[in-house]
Regions:
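Short glycine-/polar-rich loops that comprise or flank the Walker A/P-loop
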Residues: 74, 98-101, 125-129, 163-166
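P-loop NTPase switch module centered on the Walker A-proximal segment
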Residues: 2-105, 109, 149, 218-221
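A contiguous, basic/glycine-rich beta-loop/short-helix subdomain that forms a polymer-engagement track
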Residues: 213, 220-225
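Amphipathic helical hotspot of TIR/SEFIR-family domains
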Residues: 110-126, 147
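Signal for well-folded cores of large energy- and translation-related assemblies
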Residues: 16, 32-36, 53, 70, ...
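Residue-level signature of catalytic and energy-coupling elements of molecular machines
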Residues: 21, 27, 59, 78-80, ...
């Protein structure tokens, strides 16, 4: 590290908050390009900050990333925050490392509920935001309205007068310009760099005292083991330096820091020493937990532990015990699933895992929401795991003898014509309309508060009701007494296969009148597997294996052609929302199958009589 990184007044630590798709990652790409942090020969991948495959595919940021930019002789550390409340555990820890936030808002959509969640945390910590109104060159931009909405949002979140007096800058991440007026259409990002340097305070840290820092996130690498990441709060750290680690319970142990790495661009560079205010990664201490304090052995003082939101949704993971178990995956045993879940717990703080005592093949996994858990399942199946997972359920807690359940704030953006059916559907699921604002261009925005269990399984239904044109965003709001009534249950029954084999077109053709199929000709099925949605509300056991009875009278080939409706192929999220309480989702690297918990019909009957 050069001398200028030691001058604490030249250091700025900021976090970026943005709603999905408002252009956060693209903006950071531009900042890296224009500051010259990427050297000429480095090929810059689009959306550099989304490093995980799933993040790129879904366009969401799950883990917070760090990147450092050198501009003139300032060093700016930018930390990316996950925009989604399901990853709330990440958000709070990230904000503890920075001195200000850039709130990125789309110039036509305005602030959204997911940004609200992170902004609320930032304001509560006393950070003063800089508002960046992005995509200013969109034809549908309405910066004045967006600014008013942002001000109202801050006011609703109890911002102080100083926080309400925020700076605003207009930018286009895609075309790489920024300016203080909303008429800006060319130039570069200099005004944004200048604003950050002028308005953000250098870190309030003590460069002289004995070393102390807190671990705010973890990474894992099979070569060096656990890597801790955090901001140095006091003093400096060198490679191979002895430290004392204090965990959140106050237990102490001694260790040594092996490597110290600073961030430069998107790379981690090994450095000899790092100073107060720097965001660093280090190796050599294992085990390590989030919220651990590292300090100089001569001055052992713990920092207050970081709080993490409690999980709100739970589901069961179990060994895949279907007839097709082990055909497609590499990891199929309880031990392998347990090791993988334990490894996930290292860096996924908002996750909780317990092995069931009555059935050690099953694990109860709890997280911040459906998305949080489905991302874990998707990652595991890509790594070669096979397992059965149950329907997500909300976690009911008891406070002073009253049962409470989680509620979510939902924002829905639909065309006027679909408004009625969406409001009706939300009503049947226990939703209460809080606010409604038409945009005057044929769309309307609806805000609801709804029990989380009413939202499970709603997204698929919502997309059908709005013919794919609706947008829906939800964020955990609060716990409140349980609302009477059952919501979110599937209305239709299912079609269940009665044997093992390959499905035949002739049989499927005759079953099409009974409902919509999940399987096509030649798909492998087994007894107890769900192969379609029944058009009525009861389950029906059917035979998809029955071929056509042939006689020797016919001319061959004249009546072979049967017209099959293409089967429904569900994504992981859709399947999790679809399954009922007596069903499991069989997840393997190649397929997602719905099945009954009891595969044989007489077992199901016995269980239903209970």
């Amino acid at each position: 590290m050069s001398n200028n990184s030691r001058d604490i007044n030249k250091l700025r630590n900021i976090a970026i908050i943005a709603h999905v798709d408002h252009g956060k990652t693209t903006l950071v790409d531009q900042l890296l390009r224009q500051s010259g942090t990427f050297s000429e020969h480095e090929e810059l991948q689009e959306r550099v900050m989304d490093s995980n495959d799933l993040e790129r595919e879904r366009g969401i940021t799950i883990l917070s990333k760090n990147t450092a930019i050198r501009w003139n002789d300032y060093r700016i550390n930018i930390v990316d925050t996950p925009g989604h409340a399901d990853f709330g555990g990440e958000v709070e820890r990230v904000l503890s490392m920075v001195d200000s936030v850039l709130l990125l808002v789309d110039s036509s959509e305005g602030p959204m509920p997911q940004t609200r969640f992170v902004t609320q945390k930032a304001l509560a910590l006393g950070l003063k935001p800089i508002v960046v109104i992005n995509k200013i060159d969109k034809p549908s931009a309405r910066p004045g309205w967006v600014l008013d909405q942002t001000f109202d949002l801050f006011a609703n979140l109890d911002a102080t007068d100083e926080q309400l007096d925020f700076d605003v800058i207009y930018a286009s991440g895609l075309n790489g310009f920024a300016g203080m007026e909303d008429t800006v259409r060319d130039g570069d990002m200099t005004p944004l760099f200048q604003l950050v340097v002028d308005r953000v305070n250098p870190p309030a840290v003590d460069p002289e005292g004995p070393f102390r820092m807190q671990v705010t996130s973890l990474d894992y690498n099979s070569y060096v083991g656990v890597i801790g990441i955090g901001r140095i709060e006091r003093g400096k750290v060198k490679t191979n330096m002895p430290v004392t680690v204090i965990d959140p319970e106050g237990k102490k142990r001694n260790g040594r820091v092996m490597q110290v790495m600073g961030f430069m661009g998107l790379r981690r560079e090994e450095v000899e020493e790092a100073h107060a205010g720097d965001i660093i990664a280090f190796t050599g201490l294992d085990p390590l937990n989030i919220s651990d304090t590292l300090c100089d052995p001569s001055a052992v003082e713990a920092l207050p532990p970081l709080s993490v939101d409690e999980p709100t949704v739970t589901m069961t993971f179990q060994v895949n015990n279907s007839p097709f178990a082990g055909k497609e995956g590499k990891f199929v045993t309880t031990r392998q699933i347990k090791e993988r879940l334990d490894r996930e717990l290292i860096h996924n703080v908002a996750l909780k895992v317990e092995q069931l005592v009555e059935d050690p093949d099953k694990f109860r996994v709890s997280g911040r929401g459906e998305l949080h858990l489905s991302v874990l399942i998707e990652n595991m199946r890509r790594e070669g795991f096979e397992m059965g997972v149950s329907r997500p359920e909300v976690i009911i807690r008891e406070v002073n003898g009253v049962k409470e359940e989680p509620y979510e704030a939902v924002t829905i953006d639909v065309e006027d014509t679909h408004q009625g059916s969406v409001m009706e559907k939300m009503g049947t699921r226990g939703g209460e309309l809080k606010d409604m604002s038409p945009d005057g261009k044929g769309r309307v925005r609806l805000d609801f508060i709804i029990p989380s269990r009413g939202l499970i399984g709603f997204r698929t239904e919502f997309l059908t009701a709005t013919q794919g044109t609706g947008l829906i965003y939800s964020v955990f709001d609060h716990y409140a007494p349980v609302k009477p009534g059952t919501f979110g249950k599937r209305i239709n029954g299912v079609l269940i296969a009665n044997g093992v084999g390959k499905a035949v077109a002739f049989a499927i053709f005759n079953l099409q009148d009974r409902g919509r199929m999940f399987i096509g000709h030649g798909d492998e099925v087994y007894e107890g597997m769900v192969i379609g949605i029944h058009s009525r509300d009861n389950d029906l056991v059917v035979n998809p294996l029955k071929g056509k009875q042939l006689t020797n009278m016919r001319a061959s080939g004249s009546d072979e052609a049967v017209a099959l409706v293409p089967p429904i192929r569900m994504s992981l999220e859709q399947a999790l929302e679809f399954i009922g309480d007596d069903e499991l989702l069989e997840v393997t690297p190649k397929s997602i199958r719905v099945r009954k918990k009891f595969l044989l019909e007489h077992e199901r009957k016995r269980a239903s009589r209970g």
